[in-house]
């Protein structure tokens, strides 16, 4: 089910002191498997210091231009440290084909105004969207609101500047810097206060067709709160978290008072795996791995949705959910890394997508 493919690294470019752009060489695989929509991500698996580590990274390139990812160094992050400091051109990475629900559908007849609001490495999926809109939707325009610590920490700054020069009538950017004061830029983080000032001064932003938000959890919450307060329709808002909010777990969702021992069956690639699981025990994903099932996963934090599956029978509760939409949940989809049984019998299907 995991379906990892060995992919050589074609090139590595330094973006900032603590980030790199990695281009993959797809010549050895069926490139149809690696088709993607702007905004989607790949999952990389690598053995680091004797431990298999999986992480998901958004694709920053145009769909027709192959796959490249931008990786910012995370303090004490196993994968990001490896990719930034140890990976070399020609090395082979184990890569899962692109997936993800945070994407932009391109139509050359569209005449739309898109807004991307992101910070730090959250630029990576939005960058692919910007490129795609500017190249393949000639009637559409894109506004980027981009937060960083300082000018030197901006990923893909040269590319973004080229958009300003080449598409000055269709691309507009507002920069925000939290640790540096620069003329013409927002001073501070992207939050409800800075957005109110920006939108008040640029009222057309309130009438945009779609808002794509990407970055840390607290930034996402602030932006969503601002858009909600201004009655922006939910169907116009898409977001992708690159970390969980500080508010983290909602422990009320977990069944702690009444323990239920459940008979769980999961289906992966047409094969069933059976095991018993307590409602107060590990998540369904961890129990499935323990039972020998080759189930897909990456972040294990309720963010990436790689472990998404569908409940066919029974009920579950989730500790956290930062990636499934309300419609997904209503249709029975769960994040198995966050799911615990709340009924005596559970049937979970990874193939029902």
Sequence positions of predicted segments:
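FNR/FR-type flavoprotein reductase catalytic core
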Residues: 82-257, 263-267, 272
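Ferredoxin-reductase
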Residues: 2-92, 96, 148-150, 161, ...
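Iron-sulfur (Fe-S) cluster-binding segments and ferredoxin-like electron-carrier domains
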Residues: 290, 306-353
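Cysteine-centered iron-sulfur cluster-binding motifs in ferredoxin-type domains/subunits
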Residues: 278, 296-306, 336
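N-terminal pre-ligand scaffold of iron-sulfur
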Residues: 252-297
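Iron-sulfur (Fe-S) cluster-binding modules
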Residues: 1-8, 14, 18, 51, ...
